[in-house]
Every structure is written in C-alpha cells, then in structure tokens.
C-alpha cells in the first residue's frame, strides 16, 4: 500500500506522535546505551508518554536521567519522584558535586556560570560516567533560533561539542545513526512540534504535568522585568523589593530564580490551550539564561548544552 494513503487519514497530532515513536524505536535499535533526559517539564512529560507508548507493553529500554542543579522548584522534584514510582522507570539523578562544593548558584555566580557548571558540565559528566552513546532531549525547533536549525539527530564530538556546520542531511525521514568511537548523538523526537501541539497533545492524552503550569496564587517578586517565585529561603530580597501574592503560572520550568512566571488565570488544560492560541511571545522569554547575550543558546549548545 502506498505510504501516502496510510498517513492521509491521520490527524496532525497523530502524525507527530507517529514520527516521535519511529525516532524512539530507531535509536533503541541502533545504539547500545541510550538515555532519555528527563527535565520534568511539559516536553519531558510528553516524551515520557511517547516512550511508554513506543515500547508498550514493555518498559522503555533505557533509563531516564535528571540533571539536578539543586535549584529546581520543589514541586518539580516531588513530581519527578512520584512519576518514577508510578510509571516504574529507572531514574538516574546527577548533580555536579564540584559545583556544589564551590557553592555555585544563580545568585552568587550569575545565570551564565550557574547554567554552565550545574547544567552543561553536569550533563557532560553524567554522559561520560554512564557512557551513553545517544541521549533523547525535548528541544523543539519553534523554541529558539539556534534550535530552529537543529537536526533531529544532532551529532556531538567526543567532547560533547555541537558544530552546526558539521551536521548530516535528513531527507525523507531517513536518519544516519553511525557514530565514530567516542562520538554521541542528541536526539530530538519533538523537533517538529510547536508549543501549542504540546499542549493539545497533553490535553488529548490527559498527560500529568507539574502543577506549576496551572494558575494559582503564588508569592512572587518583580526582578529584572520578570516575576520570580520565592520557592525557598535562599532567595534574598533586594532593597525596595516586596513579595506579592499574585495569580500566576509558568509557561516554562527550570531553576526557580531564573524562571519568570506570567500573570494568568488558566487553571486547567483547556484554559492553557486557549491562552496559547492568542500568545504572541516565545515561552523562552521567561528564561533568564536565554537573555544573557545575543546567540547565547547557540554558544551553550556548542559547549555541550541541549
């Protein structure tokens, strides 16, 4: 039967789902030691759901790695542990202990150094420690300009570096999975999804997500044009700052001092989808790490970031 006739009756989300499942299976068949990066955000939750579907009724044939910067929202960590318990997947948590010993944090060292040491270096440490040859990530092309030119199979050097000029063509959904000794790939099954696709799929499949994505009254302080939630007592107020209880939610999740909330009353999934339909800003506008300097995401990716 002709391929087109097999796919013409699929909905937009079914096509995206089928593509992602195909990518998961391709990697599982081609690599000896894959891992899925589990950051606990909405994209990770969709990836987890797709991975469970791809290999059902067997569990996914790879562990899930969480790079813990020690500054994640507490609700994210609670959700991560609950999901691992409920779904029964193998969860690996890696913290850059050198960074902890040196006291690296977003307040003391700034977002640039904190992200490099506690995320990028920590990720490289974990990939080296477990000798993973392929790592799934939840990055999407619509998020940010350096990710827009990223391949689905992103080849990395033995030092985990990304050279955008040295990537392979991906015609007709045919992927070249060959790597030399020491090299690895980062794989992005959600490359062609948009933020709206993600939310519509979460709604359709009823995928559990961290409650921080839903609007609630939360203690926030306005700092550098962002609404930062006070998640623990490590965040000290600057002169003139006041804590306000505002109705907010998060479009994107990361380290709490670097993640801005948005004022919103979207309290359930259908509210969020409705809000996304009229949104005119990128979700990563709420990420301080992407504002460090022009082209900063590409710079981080070249150093080994996702």
Swiss-Prot record:
One of its GO terms (biological process) is sulfate assimilation. It holds the Pfam family PAPS_reduct. It catalyses: sulfate + ATP + H(+) = adenosine 5'-phosphosulfate + diphosphate. It comes from the Bacteria. Its EC number is 2.7.7.4. GO terms for molecular function: ATP binding; sulfate adenylyltransferase (ATP) activity. Keywords: ATP-binding, Nucleotide-binding, Nucleotidyltransferase, Transferase. Pathway: Sulfur metabolism; hydrogen sulfide biosynthesis; sulfite from sulfate: step 1/3. SUPFAM superfamilies: Adenine nucleotide alpha hydrolases-like (SSF52402). With CysN forms the ATP sulfurylase (ATPS) that catalyzes the adenylation of sulfate producing adenosine 5'-phosphosulfate (APS) and diphosphate, the first enzymatic step in sulfur assimilation pathway. APS synthesis involves the formation of a high-energy phosphoric-sulfuric acid anhydride bond driven by GTP hydrolysis by CysN coupled to ATP hydrolysis by CysD. Heterodimer composed of CysD, the smaller subunit, and CysN. Belongs to the PAPS reductase family. CysD subfamily. This is Sulfate adenylyltransferase subunit 2. It comes from Brucella anthropi (strain ATCC 49188 / DSM 6882 / CCUG 24695 / JCM 21032 / LMG 3331 / NBRC 15819 / NCTC 12168 / Alc 37). The lineage of its organism: Bacteria, Pseudomonadati, Pseudomonadota, Alphaproteobacteria, Hyphomicrobiales. The gene is cysD.
């Amino acid at each position: 039967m002709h391929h087109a006739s097999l796919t013409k009756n699929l909905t937009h989300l079914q096509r995206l789902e089928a593509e992602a499942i195909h990518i998961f299976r391709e990697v599982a068949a081609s690599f000896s030691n894959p891992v899925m990066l589990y950051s606990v955000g909405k994209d990770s939750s969709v990836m987890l759901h797709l991975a469970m579907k791809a290999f059902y009724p067997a569990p996914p044939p790879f562990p899930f790695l969480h790079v813990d910067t020690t500054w994640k929202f507490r609700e994210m960590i609670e959700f991560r542990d609950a999901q691992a318990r409920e779904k029964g997947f193998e969860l690996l948590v890696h913290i850059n202990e050198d960074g902890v010993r040196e006291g690296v944090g977003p307040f003391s060292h700034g977002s640039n150094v904190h992200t490099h040491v506690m995320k990028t270096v920590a990720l490289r440490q974990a990939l080296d420690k477990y000798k993973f040859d392929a790592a799934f990530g939840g990055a999407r092309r619509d998020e940010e300009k350096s990710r827009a030119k990223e391949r689905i199979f992103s080849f990395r050097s033995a030092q985990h570096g990304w050279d955008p000029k040295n990537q392979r063509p991906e015609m007709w959904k045919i992927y070249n999975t060959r790597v030399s000794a020491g090299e690895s790939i980062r794989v992005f099954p959600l490359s062609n999804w948009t933020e709206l696709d993600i939310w519509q799929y979460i709604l359709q499949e009823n995928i559990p997500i961290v409650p921080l994505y839903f609007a609630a009254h939360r203690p926030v302080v306005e700092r550098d044009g962002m609404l930062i939630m006070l998640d623990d007592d490590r965040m000290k107020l600057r002169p003139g700052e006041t804590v306000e209880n505002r109705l907010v939610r998060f479009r994107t999740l990361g380290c709490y001092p670097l993640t801005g909330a948005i004022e919103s009353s979207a309290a359930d999934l259908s509210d969020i989808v409705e809000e996304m339909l009229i949104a005119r800003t990128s979700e990563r506008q709420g990420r301080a790490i992407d504002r460090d300097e022009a082209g900063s995401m590409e710079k981080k990716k070249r150093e080994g970031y996702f």
